[in-house]
Amino acid sequence: MKIIIFTSSFLNDYMMKRFVVTLALCALAIFSVDAKKEKKLPKDIGAINERILEEGYHLYMQEKVAWIVEDVFFANQPEDSDNIGGWVPVTHDGQNVQGIFFNKEKTKVLFEVSINLETGETSSNATVRELTEDELKEISLRETVIGAVKTLDDLPAAPEGCSFNVNILKLEDDLYRVYWMLGTAQHNLIPFGCDFSYDCDSKGNIKESRKYHNSYIPAMLIMDGSPVEGIWHSHTQLSPFITPTDIALFLLYGYGNSPLTGFRVYSTVYGCYFHFDANSFQIIIIKE
């Protein structure tokens, strides 16, 4: 897993002295879990956490790329931007990514944004050209796997002030994990919750689906005019571990935008905290 080393002048102590409850989730019930019902952590918890970190990092990077691509597009909109039908990310190697904006007929590229992930440099090109065969395949694949969501029932709705962002991870040949997680333009807020994912093939056949949180968990970064010293929320059997979406959302909305360098998830199943430390990019298990 490739890790970007972040630098920060913020607090480095992950053992936070005070926490702010981010959701009224029957807090007393969280701590009244019968110890006899708590499960032991899996023997492969280290490997589980590594996979969570890796997927969380990829979700974060995909969202950052999307933000950059859209910012460049809106700052340099082509004259025929009304004919834009959508855009797709195209990765050429581990260092360079392009955002391809195509027309409604899905025949031509109207605008391109290029990003160097190592340097952060961006460039744009408004030269109209034909879509390549590979680009057409990418558009078709994304439409198919994202459209597969229509076959699922009882999905959470995006709360007011938020919308769903969709990110796709390729797990192996012809198997994709499609993440739906919240995004928001609201300031001083991390939009945890209402997220889910499913695994499907290139034809949109869903193999497995999972919900991470059933409800919206807005984590405020400012309370009573001051930055909060810590944030946490609880997970039940629905999702007993910290999630890739938790990690991605904290990196996007919390880390670097507040003094916070981490957050915690309390697992009612295992009776412990999973603490994500962004500076060291690791998950630390803290027993009560």
Say what each PLM segment does:
Residues 183-218:
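Short helix-loop boundary/capping segments
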